[in-house]
Amino acid sequence: MQLENANGEIVDEWTSDGTNHVVTELPAGDYTLKEIAAPDGYVIATDIKFTVDVYGNVTVENVEATATSENGNPLVVMIDDTTKVQISKQDITTGEELPGAKLQVIDRDGNVVEEWVSSSEPHFIEGKLIAGKEYTLKETIAPEGYEIANEIKFTVNADGSVTEVIMYDELTPKITTPYTGDNHSDFAAYAMLGAASVIIAALIITKKGKKYE
């Protein structure tokens, strides 16, 4: 966290620890509270501008009422929002959610940070992935009748908006066996049939010949 005066000079800098940070003896003037780095699972908060008058009163920009701490000191509150990622597994033809796929989110070090089986609703991950970091969506098992999809790389939005990732599955193509006729076998069959016809015809002629002798 940093506190800057109207000239952009840093008048105080600290790392939050879960307790209120106290800044004393601030001269009258305009100030900006900035978050330089957010904790993992959170996005960097919007800057807060406030003014301190000569009496020590604090007016926060766009805030009607200023909070006070337990000891009565003016309190400027900065709230961090969580990272939000929505992952959808869909049929590429219908665009409908596809249940039964086993999916993983993997970080750049190869660690599996989230694992689940898809359902009829998109999968939502909140406050677990790090803003601005790249992850890989991997399908390890596809639903029956579908092909495993290619991996998808995505980066978590750092502005507080929902990062939407869609992975499509295609149906496994049906394999048809083409007809591969064996010409040699066909010729042999026809030759045998022809030979049988010749033998039968010869027998008939022979028998007829004997009958009239």
Regions found by a protein language model. Name each.
Residues 1-213:
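Solvent-exposed loop/turn and edge beta-strand elements of beta-rich ligand-binding domains
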